[in-house]
C-alpha cells in the first residue's frame, strides 16, 4: 500500500504533515511559507481500482474527501493550533476525550 504523501499540493494549497501516529495525522495547510490553517485527519485505506480500459490504481492511503470532514477530518484556523493538537491527541486515543 502506498503511504499518504507527507507534502502535496491540492486546490492551490500546500499540505505538510506535521505529525502522524498510526492512521491519524496533523497537516498544515497554506501557500508557500504562510500557514492558513491545520487539518487533523483519519487516514483511509483505499483498495486497488481497475478502470475501464484496464488502468490499475494501486492500493494507497487516502485523505478524507470534502464530505468526510466532521467525521474523518477536522479543519482549524491558523490561530487554533492548540485545538488542532488536542483533536490530534483525541483521535490517536480512538476519539476519546482527555
Predicted segments with their positions:
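Short intrinsically disordered terminal tails
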Residues: 1-3, 90-98
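Amphipathic alpha-helical interaction segments
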Residues: 46, 82-84, 96
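A short, exposed loop/beta-hairpin motif centered on an aromatic-Gly-Thr core
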Residues: 63-83
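Short linear motifs in intrinsically disordered/low-complexity regions
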Residues: 33-40, 67, 83, 98
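Short N-terminal "domain-start" leader segments
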Residues: 1-62
Amino acid at each position: 500500500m502506498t503511504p499518504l504523501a507527507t507534502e502535496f499540493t491540492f486546490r492551490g494549497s500546500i499540505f505538510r504533515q506535521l505529525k502522524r501516529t498510526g492512521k491519524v495525522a496533523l497537516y498544515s495547510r497554506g501557500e508557500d511559507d504562510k500557514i492558513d490553517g491545520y487539518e487533523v485527519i483519519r487516514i483511509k485505506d483505499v483498495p486497488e481500482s481497475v478502470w475501464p480500459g484496464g488502468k490499475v490504481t494501486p492500493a494507497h492511503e487516502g485523505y478524507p474527501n470534502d464530505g468526510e470532514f466532521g467525521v474523518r477530518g477536522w479543519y482549524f484556523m491558523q490561530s487554533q493550533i492548540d485545538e488542532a493538537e488536542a483533536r490530534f491527541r483525541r483521535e490517536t486515543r480512538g476519539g476519546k476525550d482527555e
